[in-house]
Amino acid sequence: MATIASPMGDMFALQAIEYIAKYLPRAVNNGDDLEARAYVALANTYSGFVETISCCTSEHSIEHALSAFHPSLPHGAGLIMISWAYHEAYAPSCPERYARVAAAMGQEASVDGFLNGLNKLKEACGVDKLKMSEFGITPDLFDEYAKTAFSTMGNLFELDRCKLTPADVVSILEKSYS
């Protein structure tokens, strides 16, 4: 999704997304499913290639700000909790890329298809009910989280196709809060 995405990065990303959509729920719900675990591991490896080749988006900057203030918050849990609001805000900047991701997830090739697929994946893995409040995150610090996201990892915002502002980050956090 970053502006420095490349065909090679896209190739690995789309394959990783396909494997995650298909195999992650199986691996989460049955740890003995070695086929599912192998494909999740491969998807994880491909994702590492993508971060090296094409970087990542400011969603990671926002989450790192959250976990900096709340060290018990796992990075993945933070990403999950902000994912829907983040991608809803980001998607208008590159709907065709989201359509490709949705198709890789086996969903309708559209932004809505992606958002629906994201929700289905979260539900299938039992992480759709994560709450920011359970990790000590409170709305009174949303402005501080936004400032921290920009001051510590602002380079990712510069690589975004969607030019988010600190106010946009606060809005994403507000929509994600429970």
Cite the ranges covered by each PLM segment:
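Carboxylate- and glycine-rich phosphate/diphosphate-binding segment that chelates Mg2+/Mn2+
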Residues: M1-S54, R161
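Alpha-helical scaffold segments in soluble metabolic enzymes
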Residues: Q15-R26, Y39-L42, Y46, S61-A68, ...
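General structural signal for alpha-helix termini and helix-helix connectors
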Residues: A2-T3, R26-N30, Y46-F49, A68, ...
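Glycine-rich phosphate/pyrophosphate-binding beta-alpha loops
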Residues: T45-G76, G154-L156
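Active-site pocket-lining segment
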Residues: S72-E134
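Alpha-helix N-cap/helix-start motif at coil-to-helix transitions, marked by capping-box chemistry
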Residues: P7-E18, C56, A77, P92, ...
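C-terminal charged capping/lid subdomain of soluble metabolic enzymes
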Residues: E108-S178
